[in-house]
C-alpha cells in the first residue's frame, strides 16, 4: 500500500512502526475492493499479531526457562509416561492461574519434571502471565543471602510476588 513519506514519519514518531510495516505489507490488488475501515482493520490486526508475538517472546525470555522451546502442545503422551492428555490440556488453558491453584510435579530424576515445568511456564507466558523459573537450591541460596541484608527477605518476597507463576 502506498503511504506518503510524511505519514510514515508521523507513524514512526508515534512509535507505530509495526503498524506502518503492516500497511506497507498490504498488497494493492488485495485491498483494492475493500473500504478504508477494512484496510485499516487488516493492518491493525497484522500489527497487533506481531506485537503480541514479541510480548510473548519477551515474557519467555524474562522467565529464564531452562528449556525455552518446551511446549505443552507438543509433549509426547506415550502410554508408558503416564501423562493424562486431559490434565495437560487443562493446564495449557491456564485456569489454575486465575484460581491461584498450585501445581506440583514429582518423579524420578530425569523423568522430565523440569521440561514439563518449562512447558507450563511457556503456556502461561502465551496467556500473558509473568513466570519465573528457579531451582530450589538457587532459591535457598538467595534466601540465605537475603537474610544477611537489612530488609533483604522482604525485598526477595516482593521480587517473587510480582510473578504469577
Q: Where are the language model's segments positioned?
A:
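Interdomain "pre-motor" coupling segment immediately N-terminal to P-loop NTPase/helicase cores
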Residues: 12-68
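N-terminal pre-Walker A segment at the start of P-loop NTPase domains
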Residues: 70-94
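Short glycine-rich substrate-engagement loop in P-loop NTPases that contacts/grips substrate
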Residues: 81-88, 131-161
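Conserved catalytic network of the ASCE P-loop NTPase/AAA+ motor domain
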Residues: 95-98, 124-126, 158-161
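Walker A/P-loop nucleotide-binding motif
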Residues: 100-116
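Residue-level preference for the first positions of well-ordered beta-strands
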Residues: 102-104, 131, 165
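Post-Walker A helix-loop "phosphate-sensing" segment adjacent to the P-loop in P-loop NTPases
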Residues: 122-134
Amino acid at each position: 500500500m502506498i503511504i506518503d513519506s510524511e505519514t510514515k514519519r508521523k507513524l514512526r514518531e508515534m512509535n507505530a512502526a509495526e503498524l506502518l510495516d503492516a500497511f506497507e505489507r498490504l498488497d494493492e490488488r488485495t485491498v483494492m475492493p475493500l473500504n478504508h475501515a477494512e484496510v485499516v482493520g487488516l493492518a491493525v490486526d497484522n500489527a497487533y499479531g506481531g506485537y503480541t508475538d514479541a510480548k510473548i517472546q519477551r515474557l519467555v525470555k524474562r522467565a529464564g526457562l531452562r528449556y525455552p522451546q518446551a511446549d505443552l502442545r507438543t509433549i509426547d503422551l506415550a502410554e508408558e509416561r503416564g501423562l493424562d492428555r486431559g490434565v495437560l490440556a487443562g493446564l495449557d488453558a491456564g485456569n489454575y492461574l486465575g484460581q491461584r491453584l498450585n501445581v506440583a510435579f514429582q518423579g524420578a530424576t530425569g523423568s522430565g519434571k523440569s521440561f514439563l515445568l518449562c512447558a507450563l511456564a511457556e503456556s502461561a507466558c502465551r496467556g500473558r502471565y509473568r513466570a519465573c523459573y528457579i531451582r530450589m537450591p538457587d532459591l535457598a541460596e538467595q534466601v540465605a543471602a537475603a537474610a544477611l541484608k537489612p530488609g533483604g527477605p522482604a525485598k526477595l518476597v516482593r521480587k517473587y510476588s510480582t510473578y504469577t507463576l
